[in-house]
Every structure is written in C-alpha cells, then in structure tokens.
C-alpha cells in the first residue's frame, strides 16, 4: 500500500526528473522539497515505490526514474492542473484568429502547439467521412468543363474539375446545382453518396442527362477524399531529445512519416473519456511506440468531435503543461471552426 507521502515523493521524482533529465535521489528530494523528514525516511518511501514498480534504478545511477506505470499514476492522479498563462492564451487567439482557411488554421495549430510544448505536434484533418455537406458549388470554367467545390460543415473545401461531353449553359448549371444540393446538402458524406447515386434515376429524361455526369464525378470526389491524414510540426524536437529514446528513435520517426500508426492510435484515443487522452510507453506496444508518449484531445464543429489534435514525444515530458496546452488549443480550434 502506497502512502500519501510516498505518492508525494513520486510526484517530486517525476517533476525533478522531467526538469533535470537526471535520476533523482533521496538527498536531492529533501533539498528541493519541503517534506519535513529525513533522507532516510524518503529512501524508505522510494523503496515502497520501487516495490510497486512505480520507479526504477538505471544501471549507472543510485537515483531513481519513473517507470511507465509511475508516469501513468502521475497523469491519472497526481498531475496538477496548470492553466496557460495570459500571454500564452493571447498568442493562441491572435495566431489562430488570423487563419484564412482550414489548411491555414491547422498549419498554425501545429506550429503553435509545438512552440508551446517543445514537442512534435500533430493535428488530424477533419475526416470527410464524419463531415456533412454544407453546400456544393458549380462554376463554369469552359463550355464543357466545370469546377465542383464541395464545402463541409467542418470547414473543409474540396475542389475538382469535371470534364463533360456536352456543353452547358448557365441555366443548365443552375438546374444541376439546385438538384444536387437539394439531394445532398445537410447529409453526411456516406448518406450524400447514396442520395447522389440515386438522384439521376429520380429525374425526368432531360434533367437526368444533365445531372448524371456531375453526380458521378461528385461520387468520385467524395470517395477520393475520405482518407484521414495528419499535419505535423516540430519534428526537430524529437531529434533534440534523442537521448530520451534508449533503444532507438527510429520507430517514432517512422510513425510520423507513415502516419497510419498515429491515425490508428488517434482513433483508439477517441474512445477515451478524458478531455486529454494520454498513452504512455508500453501502452503503445501495439503501435511500436513503447518509448514514446502520445496525448491528444478531440476538437469539434457543430458540437460533435470531428478529429483530434495532440503531440508525441519521449516518456520524459512535462505532462501537466503539455496536457494544458493540448486542451486549450483543442478548445480554441473548436470555437474557431464553430464560428
């Protein structure tokens, strides 16, 4: 059974190790923290923590460092809520508030989060498969060429050029625009695809001939853009903390490059009920990231989570500060997309 003081000792070990990158001994704990007990008493507490596999001794030191289990207990029960400073909040509002479109806001988001945390920041694009169609615009580029602009409720804008066999007048384009928006606007991508596939058969001969090629092209456009993807910033931070990956930093770099692993992990984190989900060390074994920690929070549009934003870094990270930054950025991103 771990006592309250032993838990306070664990908190001190995590905080001191994160800040110093040096194993923590009983003497330094007594010197840095106000426990009011002797170093011998602290050593007894550390022995209990080691028995519970919450701390461990590196081979080259008499001090102790947190284990994955120790970090988990810290994150779940000991990490103190640390709000961002007014200056940090102002920086978020100014930088993200200047965004001009979805790509720009996500690019600014990862750069800002990386700067706030000194970690590699990750943001997931809103999945079109979870989005709803706000509007489909058709613009004439030439008599037999249209530009289709698919706009979703998450702010995503997808464009595609449609080549036609017959020339279309402006009145024809207006008729097609009205038909496809009447069928698809307000629906999820999956439901819209069904309605668009059925639409030509529900129209009279002339209207069917006009709408069918455009509906077919829109179906291809929807199918091509339903793959999730990530945007990242701050990968250089991983290189600077390379010593925190004892075996190899390669699996982390490969996960960043290939994205599939992180997308799977983000999908799993979406089921976590905490405002910021944190996956630590061996908890990432199925993803090959046993020497890394990943944290993320969902961001929303129209009241529903549409994707996640977070970061990846070594086990030795400032969990309290990083969780506060991820939470704040996700909330502001949600407000921005909800406008």
Swiss-Prot record:
Gene Ontology MF term list: DNA binding
Example of a GO biological process term: negative regulation of DNA-templated transcription
SUPFAM superfamilies per the UniProt record, alphabetical: GAF domain-like (SSF55781), Winged helix' DNA-binding domain (SSF46785)
UniProt family annotation: Belongs to the HrcA family.
Superkingdom as given in the UniProt entry: Bacteria
Name recorded for this polypeptide: Heat-inducible transcription repressor HrcA
Gene giving rise to this polypeptide: hrcA
Entry keywords, A to Z: Repressor, Stress response, Transcription, Transcription regulation
Task of the protein: Negative regulator of class I heat shock genes (grpE-dnaK-dnaJ and groELS operons). Prevents heat-shock induction of these operons.
InterPro entries: GAF-like_dom_sf (IPR029016), HrcA (IPR002571), HrcA_C (IPR021153), WH-like_DNA-bd_sf (IPR036388), WH_DNA-bd_sf (IPR036390), WHTH_transcript_rep_HrcA_IDD (IPR023120)
